[in-house]
Amino acid sequence: MVKVAVTGALGRMGSGIIKTITETDGLDVVAAIDIPNHPKKGQDIGELTGLGKIGVSLSTSDELEAILKESGAEVLVDFTAAAPCVNTAKTAAKLGVNLVIGTTGFTPEQRAEMENAISENKVAATISQNYAVGVNIFFKTLELLAQKLGDYDIEILEMHHKFKKDAPSGTALRAAEIIQNNLNRDSNIIYGREGITGERTKEEICIHALRGGDIVGDHTVIFTTDGERLELSHRVTSRQSLVSGAIRAIQFVADKKEGIYNTFDVLDLN
Protein backbone atom coordinates (compact mmCIF):
# COMPACT_ATOMS: atom_id res chain seq x y z
CA MET A 1 0.00 0.00 0.00
CA VAL A 2 1.53 3.33 -1.09
CA LYS A 3 1.05 6.07 1.50
CA VAL A 4 0.14 9.36 -0.21
CA ALA A 5 0.05 12.93 1.12
CA VAL A 6 -1.86 15.56 -0.85
CA THR A 7 -1.28 19.31 -0.61
CA GLY A 8 -3.91 21.76 -1.80
CA ALA A 9 -6.27 19.13 -0.43
CA LEU A 10 -9.41 21.24 -0.76
CA GLY A 11 -8.53 22.63 -4.19
CA ARG A 12 -10.12 21.47 -7.43
CA MET A 13 -7.35 19.01 -8.21
CA GLY A 14 -6.43 18.07 -4.65
CA SER A 15 -9.93 17.03 -3.66
CA GLY A 16 -10.36 15.05 -6.88
CA ILE A 17 -7.09 13.22 -6.31
CA ILE A 18 -8.07 12.35 -2.74
CA LYS A 19 -11.40 10.94 -3.90
CA THR A 20 -9.77 8.84 -6.61
CA ILE A 21 -7.02 7.54 -4.32
CA THR A 22 -9.70 6.16 -1.99
CA GLU A 23 -11.13 4.24 -4.96
CA THR A 24 -7.76 2.92 -6.18
CA ASP A 25 -6.29 -0.37 -4.99
CA GLY A 26 -2.79 -0.07 -3.59
CA LEU A 27 -3.01 3.63 -2.65
CA ASP A 28 -3.90 5.18 0.70
CA VAL A 29 -4.37 8.83 1.70
CA VAL A 30 -2.37 9.39 4.89
CA ALA A 31 -2.19 13.20 4.95
CA ALA A 32 -4.27 16.05 3.52
CA ILE A 33 -2.70 19.50 3.69
CA ASP A 34 -3.89 23.00 2.85
CA ILE A 35 -2.93 26.62 3.57
CA PRO A 36 -1.88 27.83 7.03
CA ASN A 37 -4.72 28.80 9.39
CA HIS A 38 -7.34 27.09 7.24
CA PRO A 39 -10.68 27.38 9.07
CA LYS A 40 -11.45 23.69 8.48
CA LYS A 41 -8.20 22.42 9.96
CA GLY A 42 -8.76 19.29 12.04
CA GLN A 43 -11.91 18.20 10.21
CA ASP A 44 -11.96 14.85 8.44
CA ILE A 45 -10.90 15.29 4.81
CA GLY A 46 -13.33 12.60 3.70
CA GLU A 47 -16.27 14.51 5.12
CA LEU A 48 -14.96 17.77 3.61
CA THR A 49 -14.78 16.20 0.14
CA GLY A 50 -18.07 14.30 0.29
CA LEU A 51 -16.60 10.84 0.86
CA GLY A 52 -17.65 10.33 4.42
CA LYS A 53 -15.18 9.90 7.25
CA ILE A 54 -11.86 8.31 6.26
CA GLY A 55 -9.87 9.00 9.42
CA VAL A 56 -7.51 11.65 8.00
CA SER A 57 -7.76 15.18 9.38
CA LEU A 58 -7.05 18.30 7.34
CA SER A 59 -3.63 19.68 8.28
CA THR A 60 -1.90 22.90 7.27
CA SER A 61 1.34 23.54 5.44
CA ASP A 62 3.01 25.36 8.33
CA GLU A 63 3.38 21.96 10.00
CA LEU A 64 4.29 20.03 6.85
CA GLU A 65 7.50 18.44 8.09
CA ALA A 66 5.87 17.05 11.22
CA ILE A 67 2.89 15.76 9.22
CA LEU A 68 5.06 13.94 6.70
CA LYS A 69 7.11 12.32 9.45
CA GLU A 70 4.07 11.29 11.48
CA SER A 71 2.08 9.93 8.53
CA GLY A 72 4.96 8.01 6.97
CA ALA A 73 4.03 9.40 3.54
CA GLU A 74 5.95 7.84 0.65
CA VAL A 75 4.65 10.11 -2.12
CA LEU A 76 3.50 13.73 -1.90
CA VAL A 77 1.22 15.20 -4.57
CA ASP A 78 1.26 18.97 -5.15
CA PHE A 79 -1.20 20.93 -7.30
CA THR A 80 -0.98 24.36 -5.62
CA ALA A 81 0.97 27.48 -6.61
CA ALA A 82 4.59 27.95 -7.61
CA ALA A 83 6.11 29.56 -4.49
CA PRO A 84 4.54 27.24 -1.89
CA CYS A 85 5.18 24.23 -4.11
CA VAL A 86 8.92 24.93 -4.13
CA ASN A 87 8.98 25.00 -0.33
CA THR A 88 6.85 21.86 -0.13
CA ALA A 89 9.08 20.00 -2.57
CA LYS A 90 12.22 20.97 -0.64
CA THR A 91 10.74 19.76 2.65
CA ALA A 92 9.49 16.49 1.17
CA ALA A 93 12.77 15.80 -0.61
CA LYS A 94 14.73 16.39 2.59
CA LEU A 95 12.59 13.71 4.26
CA GLY A 96 13.03 11.22 1.41
CA VAL A 97 9.46 11.53 0.12
CA ASN A 98 8.93 11.10 -3.62
CA LEU A 99 6.91 13.73 -5.47
CA VAL A 100 4.19 14.17 -8.09
CA ILE A 101 4.12 17.84 -9.08
CA GLY A 102 1.39 19.30 -11.27
CA THR A 103 1.77 22.92 -10.21
CA THR A 104 2.52 25.42 -12.98
CA GLY A 105 3.74 29.02 -13.19
CA PHE A 106 7.31 28.47 -11.97
CA THR A 107 10.01 30.97 -12.84
CA PRO A 108 13.20 29.39 -14.19
CA GLU A 109 14.84 30.10 -10.83
CA GLN A 110 12.04 28.40 -8.89
CA ARG A 111 12.13 25.38 -11.16
CA ALA A 112 15.90 25.08 -10.75
CA GLU A 113 15.67 25.43 -6.95
CA MET A 114 13.08 22.67 -6.79
CA GLU A 115 14.92 20.31 -9.12
CA ASN A 116 18.19 20.86 -7.25
CA ALA A 117 16.52 19.85 -3.98
CA ILE A 118 15.11 16.71 -5.62
CA SER A 119 18.48 15.74 -7.07
CA GLU A 120 20.55 16.56 -3.98
CA ASN A 121 18.28 14.46 -1.75
CA LYS A 122 18.17 11.59 -4.26
CA VAL A 123 14.40 11.25 -4.38
CA ALA A 124 12.19 10.64 -7.40
CA ALA A 125 9.69 13.10 -8.86
CA THR A 126 7.38 13.44 -11.80
CA ILE A 127 6.93 17.05 -12.90
CA SER A 128 4.37 17.87 -15.56
CA GLN A 129 2.31 20.82 -16.73
CA ASN A 130 -0.52 18.47 -17.65
CA TYR A 131 -1.12 14.87 -16.56
CA ALA A 132 -4.01 14.11 -18.96
CA VAL A 133 -3.15 11.15 -21.18
CA GLY A 134 -4.63 12.78 -24.27
CA VAL A 135 -2.62 15.97 -23.94
CA ASN A 136 0.59 13.97 -23.83
CA ILE A 137 -0.38 12.28 -27.09
CA PHE A 138 -1.03 15.85 -28.30
CA PHE A 139 2.54 16.74 -27.25
CA LYS A 140 3.95 13.68 -29.00
CA THR A 141 2.08 14.56 -32.20
CA LEU A 142 3.49 18.09 -32.04
CA GLU A 143 6.98 16.65 -32.29
CA LEU A 144 6.13 15.14 -35.68
CA LEU A 145 4.25 18.20 -36.95
CA ALA A 146 7.09 20.55 -36.01
CA GLN A 147 9.57 18.32 -37.82
CA LYS A 148 7.44 18.01 -40.97
CA LEU A 149 5.84 21.47 -41.08
CA GLY A 150 8.74 23.51 -39.82
CA ASP A 151 8.41 26.14 -42.54
CA TYR A 152 4.79 26.92 -41.59
CA ASP A 153 3.74 29.85 -39.40
CA ILE A 154 2.93 28.54 -35.91
CA GLU A 155 0.54 30.04 -33.36
CA ILE A 156 -0.68 28.63 -30.02
CA LEU A 157 -4.07 29.42 -28.51
CA GLU A 158 -5.03 28.42 -24.96
CA MET A 159 -8.16 29.10 -22.93
CA HIS A 160 -8.92 28.41 -19.28
CA HIS A 161 -11.44 29.29 -16.59
CA LYS A 162 -11.55 32.79 -15.16
CA PHE A 163 -9.92 31.73 -11.89
CA LYS A 164 -6.60 30.55 -13.38
CA LYS A 165 -3.81 32.67 -11.96
CA ASP A 166 -0.93 32.15 -14.40
CA ALA A 167 -0.71 32.90 -18.11
CA PRO A 168 0.12 31.49 -20.49
CA SER A 169 -0.67 28.03 -19.22
CA GLY A 170 2.06 25.54 -18.45
CA THR A 171 0.64 23.29 -21.16
CA ALA A 172 0.96 26.05 -23.78
CA LEU A 173 4.53 26.75 -22.71
CA ARG A 174 5.34 23.05 -22.91
CA ALA A 175 3.81 22.88 -26.39
CA ALA A 176 5.99 25.81 -27.48
CA GLU A 177 9.07 24.17 -25.99
CA ILE A 178 8.38 20.92 -27.85
CA ILE A 179 7.89 22.78 -31.12
CA GLN A 180 11.13 24.73 -30.68
CA ASN A 181 13.06 21.55 -29.90
CA ASN A 182 11.83 19.90 -33.11
CA LEU A 183 12.13 22.76 -35.60
CA ASN A 184 15.07 22.83 -37.96
CA ARG A 185 15.26 26.62 -37.79
CA ASP A 186 15.59 29.51 -35.38
CA SER A 187 12.49 30.49 -33.42
CA ASN A 188 11.43 32.74 -30.58
CA ILE A 189 8.34 32.75 -28.39
CA ILE A 190 6.23 35.89 -28.07
CA TYR A 191 3.08 36.50 -26.05
CA GLY A 192 0.09 38.07 -27.79
CA ARG A 193 0.26 41.13 -30.03
CA GLU A 194 -0.68 44.76 -29.59
CA GLY A 195 -0.30 47.97 -31.55
CA ILE A 196 1.62 48.32 -34.79
CA THR A 197 3.67 45.15 -34.70
CA GLY A 198 4.78 45.07 -38.31
CA GLU A 199 4.73 41.93 -40.43
CA ARG A 200 4.87 38.56 -38.77
CA THR A 201 8.37 37.10 -38.83
CA LYS A 202 9.05 33.48 -39.67
CA GLU A 203 10.79 32.99 -36.32
CA GLU A 204 7.72 33.86 -34.22
CA ILE A 205 5.80 31.29 -32.21
CA CYS A 206 3.05 33.37 -30.63
CA ILE A 207 1.05 32.22 -27.60
CA HIS A 208 -2.39 33.74 -27.00
CA ALA A 209 -4.05 33.27 -23.59
CA LEU A 210 -7.83 33.58 -23.13
CA ARG A 211 -9.73 33.42 -19.82
CA GLY A 212 -13.41 32.99 -19.06
CA GLY A 213 -16.19 30.90 -17.60
CA ASP A 214 -15.46 27.41 -16.30
CA ILE A 215 -13.29 26.07 -19.14
CA VAL A 216 -10.99 23.39 -17.73
CA GLY A 217 -8.37 23.67 -20.47
CA ASP A 218 -8.38 24.11 -24.26
CA HIS A 219 -5.20 24.15 -26.36
CA THR A 220 -4.85 24.54 -30.11
CA VAL A 221 -1.67 24.77 -32.16
CA ILE A 222 -2.19 26.27 -35.62
CA PHE A 223 0.20 25.61 -38.51
CA THR A 224 -0.47 27.90 -41.49
CA THR A 225 1.01 28.43 -44.92
CA ASP A 226 -0.27 29.85 -48.18
CA GLY A 227 -3.38 27.92 -49.17
CA GLU A 228 -3.89 25.72 -46.12
CA ARG A 229 -4.09 25.54 -42.35
CA LEU A 230 -3.66 22.58 -39.99
CA GLU A 231 -4.95 22.78 -36.42
CA LEU A 232 -4.18 20.33 -33.62
CA SER A 233 -6.46 20.69 -30.60
CA HIS A 234 -6.90 19.12 -27.19
CA ARG A 235 -9.80 19.96 -24.89
CA VAL A 236 -10.19 18.87 -21.29
CA THR A 237 -13.89 18.59 -20.47
CA SER A 238 -13.43 17.25 -16.95
CA ARG A 239 -10.64 17.49 -14.39
CA GLN A 240 -10.99 13.74 -13.95
CA SER A 241 -8.70 13.28 -16.95
CA LEU A 242 -6.00 15.22 -15.09
CA VAL A 243 -6.72 13.36 -11.86
CA SER A 244 -6.47 9.96 -13.56
CA GLY A 245 -3.12 10.92 -15.05
CA ALA A 246 -1.87 12.05 -11.64
CA ILE A 247 -2.88 8.69 -10.16
CA ARG A 248 -0.81 6.92 -12.82
CA ALA A 249 2.11 9.18 -11.91
CA ILE A 250 1.79 8.27 -8.22
CA GLN A 251 1.89 4.58 -9.11
CA PHE A 252 4.87 5.17 -11.42
CA VAL A 253 7.01 7.18 -9.01
CA ALA A 254 6.20 5.22 -5.84
CA ASP A 255 8.96 2.64 -6.30
CA LYS A 256 11.52 4.84 -8.04
CA LYS A 257 14.73 5.47 -6.10
CA GLU A 258 15.72 8.80 -7.62
CA GLY A 259 15.41 10.93 -10.75
CA ILE A 260 13.21 13.57 -12.33
CA TYR A 261 10.59 12.20 -14.73
CA ASN A 262 7.80 13.58 -16.89
CA THR A 263 4.55 12.18 -18.24
CA PHE A 264 6.28 10.78 -21.33
CA ASP A 265 8.12 8.51 -18.89
CA VAL A 266 4.92 7.64 -17.02
CA LEU A 267 3.10 6.76 -20.26
CA ASP A 268 6.13 5.14 -21.94
CA LEU A 269 6.06 7.62 -24.82
CA ASN A 270 9.81 8.27 -24.98
Curated annotation (Swiss-Prot):
<dbReference type="InterPro" id="IPR022663">
    <property type="entry name" value="DapB_C"/>
</dbReference>
<feature type="binding site">
    <location>
        <begin position="170"/>
        <end position="171"/>
    </location>
    <ligand>
        <name>(S)-2,3,4,5-tetrahydrodipicolinate</name>
    </ligand>
</feature>
<dbReference type="InterPro" id="IPR023940">
    <property type="entry name" value="DHDPR_bac"/>
</dbReference>
<feature type="binding site">
    <location>
        <begin position="8"/>
        <end position="13"/>
    </location>
    <ligand>
        <name>NAD(+)</name>
    </ligand>
</feature>
<feature type="binding site">
    <location>
        <position position="34"/>
    </location>
    <ligand>
        <name>NAD(+)</name>
    </ligand>
</feature>
<dbReference type="InterPro" id="IPR000846">
    <property type="entry name" value="DapB_N"/>
</dbReference>
<keyword id="KW-0520">NAD</keyword>
<feature type="active site" description="Proton donor/acceptor">
    <location>
        <position position="160"/>
    </location>
</feature>
<comment type="similarity">
    <text>Belongs to the DapB family.</text>
</comment>
<keyword id="KW-0028">Amino-acid biosynthesis</keyword>
<dbReference type="Pfam" id="PF05173">
    <property type="entry name" value="DapB_C"/>
</dbReference>
<comment type="function">
    <text>Catalyzes the conversion of 4-hydroxy-tetrahydrodipicolinate (HTPA) to tetrahydrodipicolinate.</text>
</comment>
<dbReference type="GO" id="GO:0008839">
    <property type="term" value="F:4-hydroxy-tetrahydrodipicolinate reductase"/>
</dbReference>
<keyword id="KW-0560">Oxidoreductase</keyword>
<dbReference type="InterPro" id="IPR022664">
    <property type="entry name" value="DapB_N_CS"/>
</dbReference>
<dbReference type="GO" id="GO:0050661">
    <property type="term" value="F:NADP binding"/>
</dbReference>
<dbReference type="GO" id="GO:0051287">
    <property type="term" value="F:NAD binding"/>
</dbReference>
<feature type="binding site">
    <location>
        <begin position="128"/>
        <end position="131"/>
    </location>
    <ligand>
        <name>NAD(+)</name>
    </ligand>
</feature>
<feature type="binding site">
    <location>
        <begin position="102"/>
        <end position="104"/>
    </location>
    <ligand>
        <name>NAD(+)</name>
    </ligand>
</feature>
<feature type="active site" description="Proton donor">
    <location>
        <position position="164"/>
    </location>
</feature>
<keyword id="KW-0521">NADP</keyword>
<feature type="binding site">
    <location>
        <position position="161"/>
    </location>
    <ligand>
        <name>(S)-2,3,4,5-tetrahydrodipicolinate</name>
    </ligand>
</feature>
<keyword id="KW-0220">Diaminopimelate biosynthesis</keyword>
<keyword id="KW-0457">Lysine biosynthesis</keyword>
<dbReference type="GO" id="GO:0016726">
    <property type="term" value="F:oxidoreductase activity, acting on CH or CH2 groups, NAD or NADP as acceptor"/>
</dbReference>
<protein>
    <recommendedName>
        <fullName>4-hydroxy-tetrahydrodipicolinate reductase</fullName>
        <ecNumber>1.17.1.8</ecNumber>
    </recommendedName>
</protein>
<keyword id="KW-0963">Cytoplasm</keyword>
<comment type="pathway">
    <text>Amino-acid biosynthesis; L-lysine biosynthesis via DAP pathway; (S)-tetrahydrodipicolinate from L-aspartate: step 4/4.</text>
</comment>
<dbReference type="InterPro" id="IPR036291">
    <property type="entry name" value="NAD(P)-bd_dom_sf"/>
</dbReference>
<dbReference type="Pfam" id="PF01113">
    <property type="entry name" value="DapB_N"/>
</dbReference>
<dbReference type="GO" id="GO:0019877">
    <property type="term" value="P:diaminopimelate biosynthetic process"/>
</dbReference>
<dbReference type="GO" id="GO:0005737">
    <property type="term" value="C:cytoplasm"/>
</dbReference>
<dbReference type="GO" id="GO:0009089">
    <property type="term" value="P:lysine biosynthetic process via diaminopimelate"/>
</dbReference>
